[in-house]
């Protein structure tokens, strides 16, 4: 089994599966890094699982079906516990994260120079070309509270690579979408982190999962991290 598994959480992403896998597998073929791809599906109803199973017959692609929607964080943790790879790379299914950057996120882990590598929108060279100024401003403001728990510029990024045990040791109750923030907060300054610039693109197909519940879960996560930090100091 490969040392690396790319985990892709899905919920009704059938329109993106083929496009994503063509680019991910092309990247895999062109680089010297071997990895497999694990889709963790949260009870999709649009044929996402059937599409993944079609690919599973001929490529290093696997499917883990969850009975309920556990949220992105829960899906990623479930996927990390399902596989036995040493390293995990997490990315979205909607092609907002460029698959061509996968080798850049993995090499520092394999070389032992970093513990976590983040595909960042906010370091020099990173960009969000599809977003209007108002949305970029809102994203920056939303990022500010998370900076309390870490020293990276894009702590809310969902595109990152990390040692698997950093995920499996997290609590099952991590809320919402910001699994990367949970890792950064849990391991703190002991974690060697590098940010790699990426061009973050909006999805072309399917429906965005961003809604008021996502914002609520993020606020709940921030409060949980605050209480946890206060408890440690106490």
Where would I find each of the regions flagged by the language model?
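Catalytic donor-sugar/metal-binding loop of nucleotide-sugar-dependent glycosyltransferases
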Residues: 172-175, 184-201
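Donor nucleotide-sugar binding loop of glycosyltransferases
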Residues: 13-17, 44, 98
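Conserved donor nucleotide-binding strand/loop of the catalytic core
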Residues: 35-38, 49-82
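A conserved acidic beta->alpha catalytic loop
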Residues: 41-50, 95
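Cell-envelope/extracellular polymer assembly enzymes that use nucleotide-activated donors
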Residues: 3-5, 36, 182
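N-proximal low-complexity "stem/linker" segments adjacent to membrane-targeting elements
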Residues: 1-26
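Acceptor/aglycone-binding surface of glycosyltransferases and processive sugar-polymer synthases
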Residues: 66-82, 87, 99-177, 203-216, ...
């Amino acid at each position: 089994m490969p040392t690396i598994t790319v985990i892709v959480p899905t919920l009704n992403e059938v329109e993106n599966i083929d496009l994503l896998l063509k680019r991910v597998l092309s990247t895999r073929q062109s680089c010297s890094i071997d990895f497999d791809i694990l889709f963790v599906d949260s009870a999709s109803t649009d044929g996402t699982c059937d599409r993944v199973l079609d690919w599973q017959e001929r490529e290093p692609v696997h499917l883990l079906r969850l009975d309920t929607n556990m949220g992105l964080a829960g899906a990623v943790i479930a996927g990390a516990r399902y596989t036995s790879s040493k390293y995990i790379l997490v990315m979205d299914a909607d092609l907002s994260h460029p698959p061509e950057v996968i080798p850049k996120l993995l090499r520092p882990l394999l070389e032992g120079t970093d513990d976590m590598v983040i595909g960042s929108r906010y370091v020099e060279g990173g960009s969000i070309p599809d977003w209007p100024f108002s949305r970029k401003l809102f994203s920056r403001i939303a990022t500010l509270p998370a900076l309390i728990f870490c020293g990276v510029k894009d702590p809310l990024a969902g595109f990152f690579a990390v040692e698997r045990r950093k995920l499996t040791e997290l609590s099952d109750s991590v809320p919402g979408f910001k699994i990367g923030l949970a890792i950064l907060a849990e391991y703190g300054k002991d974690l060697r982190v590098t940010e790699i610039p990426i061009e973050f693109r909006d999805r072309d197909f399917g429906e965005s999962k961003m809604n008021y519940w996502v914002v609520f879960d993020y606020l709940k996560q921030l409060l949980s991290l605050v209480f946890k930090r206060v408890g440690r100091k106490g």
